[in-house]
Amino acid sequence: MSSTQDTRLIWIDLEMTGLDTDNDQIIEIATIITDDHLNIVAEGPVLAVHQPDRILNAMDEWNTRQHGQSGLIERVRRSKLTARDVELQTLEFLKKWVNPKTSPMCGNSICQDRRFMHRLMPELEQYFHYRNLDVSSVKELAKRWRPEIMSGLKKNASHLAMDDIRDSISELKYYREYFFIKN
């Protein structure tokens, strides 16, 4: 495989029934591959993971409202895919574009996603390099060191996995332009 596959970045986002990594479940996953300059190379499948009503009915008010309004709960109910099905389909996509263990896990607050994957999709979690490219870390630095640039940042915040990834890529491009020093 070409060295290009060693420099590409895997962007991933999960939507979950909540934030409890020991008990909550993954309900949606999406991936995007970019080159090292953040240009989109490929978009992966957007997959809803079926969950029974007892899991969906246990969601807190925020998740119930957010995922209900976005249509995600209905997609989850209609889905026939298990977490393992979704894991395998995502891996099949990634293997076409990026060599194993070369890309950090990229996204916003990605540690939470990694913890869910470790428990529910371990093979997928192991496909990534151990490092993370967490845009939320850059945001925290920008808020403290250059707060004046934050008003120019616009995000969609739909809490649908593919939209959230696009937002994360756009956000990092924004920080590259307005936060990082160019020589």
From Swiss-Prot:
Top-tier EC class: hydrolase
Gene Ontology terms, MF aspect: 3'-5'-RNA exonuclease activity; nucleic acid binding
Main location: cytoplasm
One GO location term (cellular component): cytoplasm
One GO term (biological process): DNA metabolic process
Pfam families for this protein: RNase_T
Compartment annotation: Cytoplasm
Domain Exonuclease: 9-172
Entry-linked InterPro entries: Exonuclease_RNaseT/DNA_pol3, Oligoribonuclease, RNaseH-like_sf, RNaseH_sf
Residues annotated as the enzyme's active site: Y130
Lineage top rank: taxon: Bacteria
Assigned EC number: 3.1.15.-
Gene3D superfamilies reported for this sequence: Ribonuclease H-like superfamily/Ribonuclease H
Keywords: Cytoplasm, Exonuclease, Hydrolase, Nuclease
Protein function: 3'-to-5' exoribonuclease specific for small oligoribonucleotides.
Family as reported in the entry's similarity comment: Belongs to the oligoribonuclease family.
Protein name: Oligoribonuclease
Organism: Acinetobacter baylyi (strain ATCC 33305 / BD413 / ADP1)
